[in-house]
Amino acid sequence: MDDPSTLTVGYQTFMLAAGLSFLAGFIINAFIVAVNISEWKKGRMISTADKVFTSLGISRMVFQVTCLLNVFGDIYFYRLSVLFFASVLFLELSSIYSSIWLSTLLSVIFCLKISNLQNPFFLRLKILALNRVLHLIVASVVVSISFAFVYGLMAAFKILHNSTQETYLNVYTGLSVLTLIFWSTGPFLIYFISSVLLIICLYHHVSRMRSGRNTTSHLDTYYKTIKFTGFSLFSSTVYLIIDMTYTYWYDVFGLLGCYFFWQIFPTLHSIYLIYVTTKLRIQVSNIVHKLRRRCGDPKAPLETVFQ
């Protein structure tokens, strides 16, 4: 446990940079959530993917908050009761496993939409899944919260008489072993398989479009989707690896470095999501133009995704 009075200037600078990155990640995901909710409140149609993106953004916002609570709680508020550690662990586990399940659901939805298999079982699964997206989102979140609640209670009993970061680390290590076996492997395998199948399907679509001499603009859409799917799989893989090797990252980089690297990949994924999604990208562009106008540039244009 670090005493705030003994922190070096370099460490305090790194802590400030990490805190700003946590805040940036929170704001980026809050932006995604706000845009989609705003469209829904205006009565516009929200796609199944946008529903998952909104839920995923909320879970990532919660994760960013737990990163801040863990880092600053370890340094400044480490004398708080066991309730603090148990509550943070509950929020952290809820957000982590909600993100894993929601990312898996998103990959499966994309795979079902793109794939053109005519197998009766596959077609029935496709119709069932695409018509029950909201139910699947709720189920993913509820199961994750239930899991986090059970292990949060277990952690509360274990650290009842010793609420230190070392005890918290030992509890988290034990939970990581259990979740590696019973919780993370299953959804990640589904996520990996569906992502690979999606990339293969997209590649076949591109091959057929090339042979049919389709325009480059149509091919660019498929290329962007392939890149986004690959980057999503990479980000989720690193995110899960850090979760499962928490103690290694803690030993090498300390608590601050561990959470900094842990949260940076979901943040980068959210930034990339804004880049590839037209309505999100246009909203960012409009915000920039409004800022330019306030700074004295009256010619800065505003765009709209709805014509």
Predicted segments, located by residue:
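Intracellular signaling interfaces of 7-transmembrane GPCRs
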Residues: 39-48, 115-132, 196-222, 278-307
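Helix-to-loop junction signature of class
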Residues: 61-78, 103, 146-160, 227-230, ...
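Extracellular-loop-to-transmembrane junctions of the mid-late helices
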Residues: 21, 146-153, 167-194
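Seventh transmembrane helix
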Residues: 101-102, 231-237, 241-307
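Class A (rhodopsin-like) GPCR signature focused on the TM5-ICL3 interface and adjacent 7TM helical core
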Residues: 104-105, 155, 181-211
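Intracellular effector-coupling site of seven-transmembrane GPCRs
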Residues: 51, 55-58, 203-240
